[in-house]
């Protein structure tokens, strides 16, 4: 009975190891594909599109209304 329990425990541990390593390898592979792909190299810095340095008068008026 102890032998069967030890085999079951080892099987569960190995299955967990395989399933977690599959997730890690797929994440690494998608990262490599993202870096080496055409779009991955062009869109390396996505934060530049989010920042707009110019603040218009309408934006300032809207912010003033929010702060009231």
Swiss-Prot record:
Extent of the signal sequence: 1-23
Q: Does the keyword Transcription regulation apply?
A: no
Propiece residue ranges? 40-68
Query: Where is this protein localized, as stated in its record?
Result: Secreted; Target cell membrane
Where is this protein chiefly located?
secreted
For this record, the Gene Ontology CC terms, alphabetical, are:
extracellular region; membrane; other organism cell membrane
Leucine amide (modified residue): where?
Answer: 36
Give the tissue specificity: Expressed by the venom gland.
Domain of life, per UniProt, equals Eukaryota
The record's keywords, sorted A to Z, are:
Amidation, Antibiotic, Antimicrobial, Cleavage on pair of basic residues, Cytolysis, Hemolysis, Membrane, Secreted, Signal, Target cell membrane, Target membrane, Transmembrane
**Listed GO biological process terms:** defense response to bacterium; killing of cells of another organism
Purpose: Antimicrobial peptide that inhibits the growth of Gram-positive (S.aureus, MIC=1 uM) and Gram-negative bacteria (E.coli, MIC=15 uM and P.aeruginosa, MIC=2 uM). It also shows 37% of hemolysis when 15 uM are tested (93% at 50 uM).
Q: Give the record's family classification.
A: Belongs to the non-disulfide-bridged peptide (NDBP) superfamily. Short antimicrobial peptide (group 4) family.
Protein name from the UniProt record:
Antimicrobial peptide UyCT5
* Species this chain originates from: Urodacus yaschenkoi
């Amino acid at each position: 009975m102890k032998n069967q329990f030890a085999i079951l425990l080892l099987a569960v541990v190995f299955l967990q190891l395989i399933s977690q390593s599959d997730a890690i390898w797929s994440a690494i592979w998608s990262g490599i594909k993202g870096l080496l792909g055409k779009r991955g190299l062009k869109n390396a810095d996505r934060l530049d599109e989010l920042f707009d340095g110019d603040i218009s008068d309408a934006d300032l008026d809207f912010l003033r209304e929010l702060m009231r």
